Amino acid sequence: MKLLKDSGAALLALFFVLVYLLPVNSRLLWQPDETRYAEISREMLQRGDWVVPYFMDIRYFEKPVAGYWFNNISQWIFGDSNFAVRFGSIFSTALSAVLVYWLATLLWRNRSTSVLATLIYLSFLLVFGIGTYAVLDPMISLWLTAAMVSFYLTLKAENWQQKVGAYALLGVACGMGFMTKGFLALAVPVIAVLPIVIQQKRIKDLVVFGPIAIVCAVLLSLPWALAIAQREPDFWNYFFWVEHIQRFAEASAQHKSPIWYYLPILCIGVLPWLGLLPGALFKGWRERATKPELFFLLSWVVMPLLFFSVAKGKLPTYILPCMAPLSLLMAAYATDCANNIRMRALKINGVINLLFGVACALVIVVIGLGLVKDIVAYGPQENQKVWLGVLAFAGWGVTGFITLRNNARNWRWAAACPLLFILLVGYLIPQQVVDSKQPQNFIKNNFSELSSSRYVLTDSVGVAAGLAWELKRSDILMFSEKGELTYGLAYPDSQDNYISNDDFPTWLAQARKKGDVSLVVQLARNEALPAHLPSADKVNLMNRLALLWYQKTP
């Protein structure tokens, strides 16, 4: 315990290296998300075009461009590696952690509490899971965190010059957020600050100085917004109506889920600190009058959470911006409990980690040994993965037990509960999942046929992205299914990138005259190869992915 308090910064740096840097290159990329963002940035670098996103030579208007820039720079510096693909997310998470530390220092002027808040943030299961995963959510979370820190500076500004500067920073953060994921970056800060503005009677300041933030956000994003409007006039129409209105509000929204969807996600996401969640939130509400900084954090957590819960389209990644203020609330609550020797919540947290680790280890044993007839996760040759999984979660439980000893004096070590799991998770994934969701393994095993093929087709966008990334070619064709490329494939100059089921036999006969053809098909569980496909010269089936290789004909 004393070691953690005296060497907090060094241990924090060690934790970050162990969790966020060392293991990520050895983990295969997941489809569709990681393969998609890897390939988009690879093509941007190859084209030298940082304005219009293309995905396998097809226009891709689902997101603005700033998030891709992070990934572009990562690949430019670190090359073609899984680490490079994920470094944009890792770097964004690191900057968010720095902002958490800085804001904690501004709030409480206590180095120990600042280190604790940062440690809690980095050890959240949700933050780790998304922060080492190649998606754009860590980037938008960074800019939303920066926006809220900037807003806090507006509250503490002592003169009009400081207020102008703070609101300008707020505008820059919102502008970068807008260029990363769109209008969401403008809506969330407004929703989060409204209760704070009302409580602290700062409506006049918001009205007077708020336009400065708007002007700065507009000036920052305007050059790219005009450039893409000139190059692709339909971008803003598609991006606003389809990617915002339909995704979040309409009955046809993607990823529809019930209003309570985020409750279990939040509980799992804050592990290994779940025991502090109720007390931290209650403390923020109970002390809202005497400690307005706690209400600031509470509003920052609750208002975006309510907004995302009301929206029809939901994904676990959406609530990542709520984790920064939650880590600060938990740090304040835990420090208060420890200082006043009220150890009940800290003990409960230890018990939760102990039970969670034991329960997960038992589940892996039961499923891994095939004791549940209808659930087959691991094959007969994967016993090593089963026991590694047991070891990972046993480590979680044992660490939870250690935090309970001596009246929970070692409660800070809860951050180490998921450490073994994090280091081993890449080696625990069942082979059937690897072969369906991590196409790099399949591509590696079929690289000779794929790399020599004149044409490569697939019926899965995620697999197509993996093929494009691994083969370093953007001319992968879509077969039978269009998926998220439906809009881009509608452009006249992209229609040849899609081959329908009905057209495939005729197209194949002509294509084989020019070279070998590889067709990669993703199958449903226990599905046989489609009988209507022309007979291939070679077939390689690996669980749910199949390669049909057609040799060049004279």
UniProtKB/Swiss-Prot annotation:
The chain crosses the membrane at residues 4-24, 87-107, 115-135, 178-198, 206-226, 262-282, 293-313, 315-335, 351-371, 384-404, 414-434. Pathway: Lipopolysaccharide metabolism; 4-amino-4-deoxy-beta-L-arabinose-lipid A biosynthesis. The keyword Transmembrane applies. It is found in: Cell inner membrane. Pfam families: PMT. It is a multi-pass membrane protein. Its EC number is 2.4.2.43. One of its GO terms (molecular function) is mannosyltransferase activity. Keywords: Cell inner membrane, Cell membrane, Glycosyltransferase, Lipid A biosynthesis, Lipid biosynthesis, Lipid metabolism, Lipopolysaccharide biosynthesis, Membrane, Transferase, Transmembrane, Transmembrane helix. It comes from the Bacteria. GO terms for cellular component: plasma membrane. It catalyses: 4-amino-4-deoxy-alpha-L-arabinopyranosyl di-trans,octa-cis-undecaprenyl phosphate + lipid IVA = lipid IIA + di-trans,octa-cis-undecaprenyl phosphate. It is an enzyme of class 2 (transferase). GO terms for biological process: lipid A biosynthetic process; lipopolysaccharide biosynthetic process; protein O-linked glycosylation; response to iron(III) ion. Belongs to the glycosyltransferase 83 family. NCBIfam families: PRK13279.1. HAMAP family: ArnT_transfer (MF_01165). Catalyzes the transfer of the L-Ara4N moiety of the glycolipid undecaprenyl phosphate-alpha-L-Ara4N to lipid A. The modified arabinose is attached to lipid A and is required for resistance to polymyxin and cationic antimicrobial peptides. This is Undecaprenyl phosphate-alpha-4-amino-4-deoxy-L-arabinose arabinosyl transferase. It comes from Yersinia pseudotuberculosis serotype O:3 (strain YPIII).
